[in-house]
Amino acid sequence: MITHGFYARTRHKHKLKKTFIMLSAGLGLFFYVNQNSFANGENYFKLGSDSKLLTHNSYQNRLFYTLKTGETVADLSKSQDINLSTIWSLNKHLYSSESEMMKAAPGQQIILPLKKLPFEYSALPLLGSAPLVAAGGVAGHTNKLTKMSPDVTKSNMTDDKALNYAAQQAASLGSQLQSRSLNGDYAKDTALGIAGNQASSQLQAWLQHYGTAEVNLQSGNNFDGSSLDFLLPFYDSEKMLAFGQVGARYIDSRFTANLGAGQRFFLPENMLGYNVFIDQDFSGDNTRLGIGGEYWRDYFKSSVNGYFRMSGWHESYNKKDYDERPANGFDIRFNGYLPSYPALGAKLMYEQYYGDNVALFNSDKLQSNPGAATVGVNYTPIPLVTMGIDYRHGTGNENDLLYSMQFRYQFDKPWSQQIEPQYVNELRTLSGSRYDLVQRNNNIILEYKKQDILSLNIPHDINGTERSTQKIQLIVKSKYGLDRIVWDDSALRSQGGQIQHSGSQSAQDYQAILPAYVQGGSNVYKVTARAYDRNGNSSNNVLLTITVLSNGQVVDQVGVTDFTADKTSAKADGTEAITYTATVKKNGVAQANVPVSFNIVSGTAVLSANSANTNGSGKATVTLKSDKPGQVVVSAKTAEMTSALNANAVIFVDQTKASITEIKADKTTAVANGQDAITYTVKVMKGDKPVSNQEVTFTTTLGKLSNSTEKTDTNGYAKVTLTSTTPGKSLVSARVSDVAVDVKAPEVEFFTTLTIDDGNIEIVGTGVKGKLPTVWLQYGQVNLKASGGNGKYTWRSANPAIASVDASSGQVTLKEKGTTTISVISSDNQTATYTIATPNSLIVPNMSKRVTYNDAVNTCKNFGGKLPSSQNELENVFKAWGAANKYEYYKSSQTIISWVQQTAQDAKSGVASTYDLVKQNPLNNIKASESNAYATCVK
């Protein structure tokens, strides 16, 4: 059987888009049949009462028998020793049911199997010798065996000779049948059937010998989508078929071959089978093992297949920067047909594959452990044509729609049987599908893995004192070159720090601006970085830990970096304890077995110990108890620390009285503008329960409270706000009537509004203050001045490529023509900005080497600029910026003699003028053809 298939596939998300069914005429396949190639595949028949009927699944081995008067199907079954189920399997397409067949009347036809020739000779004919041929009949009607004439025994026998010989045998058979007891109609039908079968027996035998072929040709796109599959029987008996199957396909620009073998075991009503396949993707060098099982019945097929990779990771054939390997998986398939309407069929399949990035639908949509369910229907109006539609729905709401049309031409069947609807039923029976191809996924589903084409590593964490600038060491490996690094420094920015580019030419030159040290709080910040290359690929996320030390701490010092209590209050009963934990690190690394001393700074309480050693995690603990109500402050210190680190104050309370158990401020700094408020929250408890409607009295050393007294709510909380118009530090205290002792909140500080004075910009080269000049000297520097806030500033630039800024000093370096914003953040988290406007022009000295005048002109032209129009233009630059070597970039230059544009007279004379940006010294009549000056360009 040769099958031509044509398919159209559409992919869609949520909705199915319009699709078109591609139809095409099948390609004709012609065979030249050589007698020698299949002489040993002949069927030999003898008709006699001593032989038994054997079933066979090919039409040429079946007999169309006409019932005689008084004869029934049951009579034939008994007399010929044929199971009724066997007769029914051959006649399903002629009768609507088995009972209808049993009622067949005289004159109606019944298909019966022919009998095979037993071995009556010492050996079968040798290849190429004359085979013995007998006509067909039923048991009890013996025909004598006829030997082929010498003319047709030669190995070069032609098809015409074979056909003529078959006709002669048919004529001889006709005369013999007329003399038998069979009726005339039967003799006529038998003679005609045998004659026709003999005429095509050579071709049929060849096709049966070579099994089933299925071809799908796609003419477009260099035949992408085409395939060929071939099933070859090795051994074929009534109850068992052993076969091999080979296939090849060219799909998605990959050439894949399949080689398998299996067995099918036929029972009266069903078939059980197994198969093993090796799949080889020659384009991508992928190998896979497939193991499958089959269970078929009339009008029903099912199969299960497992797929197991035999090759590992290697560079992908068609997916750039990825490795690939076969994905392990399985599928379960069901196909069913309506016995009452066999032209209509249904399909159900589930498939599952395993891996992190599996391309079940396509290589552009990678999924983790994807699965998909497929439902489909097909329609076969005649055996020649089958049309179908499949819908597949999978993981991630992926959808797939497949329209198909197959043209199936069976060379072992007459043309009339391939275009008549009544023969469709035969295709759906177990006997009719005996040689069908194994139902499996012959395409190798692949799993992908991104290659390590870009990696980022930060080998060292950062430890530094507050508000310092620390260089970040980065190690980048990139296949396509580094484009940028994206940082998530939100935790650092929330406290006034940041990660910024240093302004150099390197894309990986970054620095960390450390925020102010938070007394009693966490001073460890987690920052992540991700690198991107020039092709848009990204690296893994890399974590950088930044530890901020107070000014009293020293880098490389073994010191307490965090000191906290497990709660803010406890009972003043001498029993309930508050536990303190001190964390000791050196350059951000926890230090074990370090002695830590503890002291009570204020208040009355008792420590469990005056010192303790750190454990393996760098932590030392101590407990605190008191039998007197009040606030207590405890400190911790290592031997290398010059000053101790205080923890936040805790409160011991009398449980029999309404007491303040907690007081806190929402921030520690604010602007002294009378509007920026700090909110204080006090909690009042008695025993273990909050006290409502309790009056709390507040006092402050600076600023204005929203109220001097507030009553607690149902949860025991009372709140007030504090504002100030005067800069300075403020201490707020709270008290309740039952306890005569004040409870103090953490100290806060008010600052004036942070501003940048854009009219007081200092030019580094001249010391002159004022507005920023509108003509820039590249790499010229200016100092910005901020005022207000807490006086501790962190500077940053929105675009360091235009103008970078020193994070601590506010010194700006001008680099390229453009605009950017400079920001300053004070430790009280105020922010002020200054926008640098695009200059009218940028003076760019090219310091690589001295060049001729014409080379200088070309250099500036390539740069997108031109030479200065005159010496006066450069003189104005000198007046605005001073000597160029006053700036860091030019500090090693003793002179920067620069060409200026020639006048008409200069051009005639071959001379030009120059101007020195370090020493001024304007010169004229300098020979233009010699390398006497630099190319300083105006952009």
Curated annotation (Swiss-Prot):
Residues 842-939 are annotated as: C-type lectin domain. It comes from the Bacteria. Residues 189-430 are annotated as: Inverse autotransporter. Keywords: Cell adhesion, Cell outer membrane, Disulfide bond, Membrane, Repeat, Signal, Virulence. Transmembrane segments: none annotated. Residues 750-939 are annotated as: Required and sufficient for interaction with intimin receptor Tir. Has a signal sequence, a periplasmic Lys M domain, an inverse autotransporter domain (residues 189-430) predicted to form an outer membrane-embedded 12-stranded beta-barrel, followed by an extracellular passenger domain (residues 450-939) with 4 Big domains (residues 450-550, 559-653, 658-751 and 755-842) and a C-type lectin domain (residues 842-939). Beta-barrel forms a hydrophilic pore for the translocation of the passenger domain to the bacterial cell surface. 'Inverse' autotransporters have an N-terminal translocation domain followed by the passenger domain, as opposed to 'classical' autotransporters which have N-terminal passenger and C-terminal translocation domains. NCBIfam families: intimin_all, intimin_alpha. Belongs to the intimin/invasin family. PANTHER family: ATTACHING AND EFFACING PROTEIN HOMOLOG-RELATED, ATTACHING AND EFFACING PROTEIN HOMOLOG-RELATED-RELATED. This is Intimin.
